[in-house]
Amino acid sequence: MRDMMGMMKQAKELQAKMKAMQDEIATMEASASSGGGLVTVTLSGKGTLSALKIDPSLMKEDEVEILEDLIIAAHNDGKAKLEAAMAEKTQSLTAGLPIPPGFKLPF
């Protein structure tokens, strides 16, 4: 019975820590650039694109496809940075818990 109570207490503590981590992640931002800084994006912790900067030299009709590719590349880089930061925070939170490798938490 004591073990069950201890597990319940640990679960509540973990739940509170996860909520705090989710709140912290929501306030994070990640910026990434492509094309040597010609395109820069900023993503919120939830992955929403919050800012986009484009160098005016790319505003040419014959360079639309290049611009599109640079925006996608910058966005993907920013998303990868956010995912890495979230994984690091999650790993520190769940250290010592028997979670299978590759298991993704629901946030």
Curated annotation (Swiss-Prot):
InterPro entries (alphabetical): YbaB-like_sf, YbaB/EbfC
Gene3D superfamilies reported for this sequence: Nucleoid-associated protein YbaB-like domain
Keywords tagged on the record: Cytoplasm, DNA-binding
Primary location group: cytoplasm
GO cellular component, one term: cytosol
Disulfide cysteine pairs (residue numbers): none
Pfam families per UniProt: YbaB_DNA_bd
SUPFAM superfamilies per record: YbaB-like
Subcellular location: Cytoplasm, Nucleoid
Function text: Binds to DNA and alters its conformation. May be involved in regulation of gene expression, nucleoid organization and DNA protection.
Protein family: Belongs to the YbaB/EbfC family.
The protein, known as: Nucleoid-associated protein BMEA_A0033
Organism encoding this protein: Brucella melitensis biotype 2 (strain ATCC 23457)
Lineage: Bacteria, Pseudomonadati, Pseudomonadota, Alphaproteobacteria, Hyphomicrobiales
